[in-house]
Each structure stands twice: as structure tokens, then as C-alpha cells.
């Protein structure tokens, strides 16, 4: 697979929901999704479009949906085939914190040189806690982060100081 500058990856609510019996609580009537939360946030598309229009290679991977549709999918092998400087994982809703953090652990073990970035509503609220996890390098805070994401990608590409990137927590 061609190398990407950024892969935006949507994890399932629980990793690995295919191997464990879990009792799921109710899902909002407003969000047409199963308890696996297979719908990625709309912001993935706006961030990807903005970065692509500025010359970056961006791919969206809906891992939750892929796993839901293929019970035999080998997640480790699939993730190993991906190649990106940065993997962005959404933590939009708190119920999918476990899945996002576990997939980030897998990515860290498979791609130790790549940066792991979290974003979304819950990431914003819990950025101080998230950044303490060893598998989390960066947290983009806020909504409508297309401009800060562009600044982040440019800073990483040019090995510049991250202090000038708005809305960013890092270690």
C-alpha cells in the first residue's frame, strides 16, 4: 500500500468485540449505529479534504465497519500493511474509549516510528488523561480542526516546534 501522510482510523467501541461476549447498553436513536459504533465522525471527511487540497496524502480507514462485516478479518495483518507518518484515531464518544486505546496499542507495536494522534469530543475533554497513555503521542483538541491539523502536519513534516500548533497537546 502506498505511504500516506495521515491515516484517519475509526476503531470499534470495544476491541475485539468479535471474541468477547459483551452486554451493550442502548445506543442513541439519533445516531444510526450499532453498539460497535461503526460510523466514523463527519470531521474525518472535512479534515481529509482540507489536507488533500493542501497536498497531503490522507486515507480514511473504518476499522470498526470492516471488523463488523468480516468476522475473520486479521486486524494485525491489515494494520501492518498500512503505512503512514501519522495515524489519527477518533475518540468522539466515551463509550468507544477502550476500542480506540486498544487499537492505538496495536498500531504502536506495529508502527513504532509513526505518530499516534487522538481527536474528537471525548479526546478534547480528556486530553490531559489521554496524553499519559504510552500509545498516545498527540491530542488535537476542539471541533473543526482542519486549520490546526494542517499546521500540525506541516510542523511534523518540517520537524518544527509544536508550540505553534493551536489546540494541540503532546509529549
Model-identified regions with their sequence ranges:
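Short amphipathic alpha-helical segment that frequently serves as the phosphate-/nucleotide-binding helix
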Residues: 23-27, 41-45, 101
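Glycine-rich beta-alpha loop elements in corrinoid/cobalamin-binding modules
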Residues: 43, 50-171
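Proline-rich low-complexity regions
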Residues: 11-12, 40-41, 127
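Nucleotide donor/acceptor-binding cores
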Residues: 2-4, 85
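Short glycine-rich His-centered loop
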Residues: 4-36
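A structural preference for long, well-packed, hydrophobic secondary-structure segments
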Residues: 32-50
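Short, basic and Ser/Thr-rich N-terminal targeting/leader segments
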Residues: 2, 38, 45, 162-164
Amino acid at each position: 500500500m502506498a505511504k500516506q501522510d495521515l491515516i484517519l482510523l475509526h476503531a470499534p467501541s470495544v476491541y475485539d468485540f468479535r471474541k468477547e461476549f459483551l452486554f451493550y447498553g442502548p445506543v442513541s436513536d439519533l445516531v444510526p449505529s450499532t453498539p460497535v459504533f461503526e460510523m466514523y465522525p463527519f470531521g474525518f471527511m472535512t479534515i481529509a479534504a482540507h489536507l488533500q487540497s493542501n497536498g497531503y496524502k490522507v486515507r480514511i480507514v473504518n476499522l470498526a465497519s470492516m471488523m463488523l462485516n468480516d468476522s475473520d478479518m486479521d486486524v494485525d495483518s491489515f494494520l501492518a500493511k498500512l503505512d503512514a507518518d501519522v495515524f489519527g484515531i477518533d475518540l468522539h464518544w466515551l463509550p468507544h474509549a477502550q476500542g480506540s486505546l486498544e487499537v492505538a496499542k496495536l498500531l504502536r507495536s506495529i508502527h513504532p516510528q509513526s505518530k499516534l494522534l487522538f481527536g474528537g469530543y471525548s479526546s478534547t475533554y480528556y486530553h490531559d488523561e489521554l496524553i499519559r497513555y504510552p500509545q498516545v503521542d498527540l491530542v488535537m483538541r476542539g471541533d473543526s480542526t482542519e486549520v490546526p491539523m494542517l499546521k500540525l502536519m506541516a510542523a511534523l513534516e518540517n520537524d518544527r516546534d509544536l508550540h505553534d500548533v493551536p489546540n494541540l497537546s503532546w509529549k
